[in-house]
A protein has these predicted regions:
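Generic short alpha-helical hydrophobic face used as a protein-protein interaction/packing hotspot
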Residues: 14-15, 111
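N-terminal secretory signal peptides that target proteins for export/translocation
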Residues: 1-2
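Sec/Tat signal peptide C-region and signal peptidase I cleavage site
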Residues: 16-20
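Sec-dependent N-terminal signal peptides
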Residues: 5-14
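Extended interaction-bearing regions that mediate binding to partners or small molecules
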Residues: 21-118
Length: 118
């Protein structure tokens, strides 16, 4: 079952509190992401982006779905002493002729180590 891009980004950053916040936004996308796409993006953000230097960029791709993209740490800042980050996401697909889609989300780290969209 394919999921809309924004749901993917939620899972990516996400953790449960962020997903609850994001689902109400109703943003549309021409690219459908699979559960495996979401898992790949989440792993890349967690392992290669969160907590790294500003400008860090990581790529991802899924040969099964034909979807791919990049993730870039745009900015680091703090809110009430909590570390926060602005992360840019570029999503694309090989399945249809469509332009890459760009998103930026801000998230802050919670005391338990998880990240929440802010």
């Amino acid at each position: 079952m394919a999921l809309k891009v924004m749901v993917l980004i939620v899972a990516l950053i996400a953790w449960l509190p962020a997903e609850a916040q994001f689902l109400g936004l109703g943003l549309e996308s021409n690219i459908e992401l699979t559960k495996n796409d979401l898992a790949i993006i989440h792993r890349i953000v967690d392992e290669q982006v969160h907590g790294k230097a500003v400008g860090t960029t990581a790529s991802w791709s899924n040969s099964e779905s034909g979807n791919y993209g990049s993730i870039k740490l745009i900015k680091k800042y703090s809110v009430n002493g909590r570390p926060c980050e602005s992360i840019g996401y570029t999503l694309a697909t090989r399945k249809m002729s469509t332009s890459p889609e760009h998103y930026m989300l801000n998230s802050c780290q919670l005391p338990d180590g998880s990240w929440r969209i802010s």
